[in-house]
Amino acid sequence: MEGGFFTADVLSVQRLRAGARDELLKWSKGTVYPASGTSAKSEVASLAIEEARKKIESLLPGGNIWFTSGPDEAANWAIKGISAAQRRKGSKIIAAPDSHLSILNAVRSIQGEEGVIASTASAINIETGVLLDIQRWEQNISENHPHARRIIDARGAIGRIDLAPLTRSSDVIILDSETCGGPVGVGALWVRKGVRIEPLIHGSGQENGRRSGTVPISLVCAFAAACIEAELKRTTNTKLWNKNHSQLEDAIRSIHGIIHGETEARAPGITCASIPGYFAEIRIQHLEERGIIVSPASGCSSTAGKPSHVLTSMGVDTDTAMRSLRFSLPEDTTSKDLKRLIEALQN
C-alpha cells in the first residue's frame, strides 16, 4: 500500500522491484555516457548493457535479446521485420482475435493475401490470464503452415510462467519490462539464432545494426534486474497469488460476478471479472474514492468507454464486457489489503 492507496492491478502500473530501482538510480547519477561512444566511460556503459542482455538471455536460451522502447515497438518490429524478411515467400500473417492491439494493428497495417509467413499468439492473455495451449498452437501451424515463423507475445510472462516452452516453440518473443517490476519505456525482442528479421528503425546502427537509437543504459539494466528477481521469486509468488486470487474470485462469485476464462488454464495472479451493477468506469471511480486502484479489463485508458476486444472475441456480450475489471494483486498483498478490497466490492 502506498500513500493510503492499495493498487489491486499491478499490471497497469509501474511498480519497481528493489533491484530495478537500484539499477535505475545507479545509472542515472551524474553524466551518463552513451554506450556507442569511444571514451572509456562509454566502454563501461557498453559492458553494462551487454551484461544486462546476458542476464535476460540466460532466462531465454537459444536466442538473442535486442532492446526496444517497449513491448509495442517490439510487437511492431516482430510483425514488420518478419514480413520484410519473408516477403518473397508471402505476405499474410495470422493473428488471434484476442491478441494485444499492438499486434492486431501492426498486422492490419501490412496484411497481404498471399502465403502465410507468420503466426502470432499470446503466451498469456494479459486481460484474462488465460494461457496459450502451446502444443495445440504449434501443431496447428505445423500441419497448416509449416514454413511460417512463430511469434509469441510474452507480456506478463516473466515471473509468472515457465519460459522454457516459449523458447522451444517460437522464432521471436515479445518482452516487456513493467509487468515484471521493471521501468516503463523499455522492452525487448528475443530472436532465435539463425532467424532473419529486418530492422524496424533505421539510423546509426545500434544493437548490432538491428535497432538504431541510443540504448538507455539505466532502463535496460533495471529491466534485467527486474527479470532476474521476478524469476527467482516465481515459485513463492505463485503460491501467494493462487491463495489470494482464489479468495478474491470466491468473493466476486458471491455477488454474482463472472470470472472470465475460469474454466481454462490461467496464469497466476490475474483475474478478469464482470460484476453486476455499475459499468467498469463508474466502479473504478467508486473504488478509488475508497483508496483502491483497479483497471478496466484492458488495463488501458486508450480503450476507456469501449468493451474489451478480448472479451468480445471470447463471446462475451457488450453489456457484460463493459462491467469487467482486471485484478492483478501485488505479491506483498496482506490479508488486510485483501479484506479491504473484497469489502469494497461487496458493498
Give the label of every model feature segment.
Residues M1-N347:
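Pyridoxal 5′-phosphate
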